[in-house]
Amino acid sequence: MQKFLISISISLFYLLALPMQAQSLLPDTLGAKVRYEATIEMKSGYLSGICVMIKNEKDIKGCLFNEFGISALDFTYFPDRKKIKLDGVIKMLNKWYIKKVLKKNLLQLMDNLQQGICTYHDEKYKINYNFLLLRDATEK
């Protein structure tokens, strides 16, 4: 009996020591919808609001809108090609050099969300992205 308990203990130890796979925070099934409390902080200000992402057949559509319902950012993420397309940006951010940085950072943020990490910090431009999953935010 004692040998049996020792073998179970050793087996459990090895199972618990295996690296665990982080759960993706992106929508995974067709039509799945995920909502985040989103904050983008820059030196000159910040954007905050709700980000909704919906999984389509080949891409993930995302929209970031503020507390007043004004859409600040619409984008499409193509996971198979690792590309971001900005579909709509508010006037304040609608400059080629800002959109270039935004696309690069959103792509990195999507990679982080896929690994279960909900933040990204751009060291060069000092921009912080925080996407916190809202409770009961996943709909299928």
Label each region the model flagged.
Residues S24, E37-T39, I70, P79-K140:
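Mature, soluble, non-transmembrane domains
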Residues S7-A17:
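Bacterial N-terminal signal peptides
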Residues S44-Y46, K124:
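Residue-level detection of beta-strand-connecting loop/turn positions
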Residues A32-R35, E57-K58, Q114-G116:
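A short, compositionally biased
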Residues L26-M42:
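A short, Trp-centered hydrophobic/proline-enriched beta-strand micro-motif
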Residues A17-S24:
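Boundary at the C-terminal end of the N-terminal hydrophobic targeting segment
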Residues M1-L5:
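Positively charged n-region of N-terminal signal peptides that target proteins for export
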Residues S48-D80:
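N-terminal, post-signal-peptide region of Sec/Tat-exported proteins
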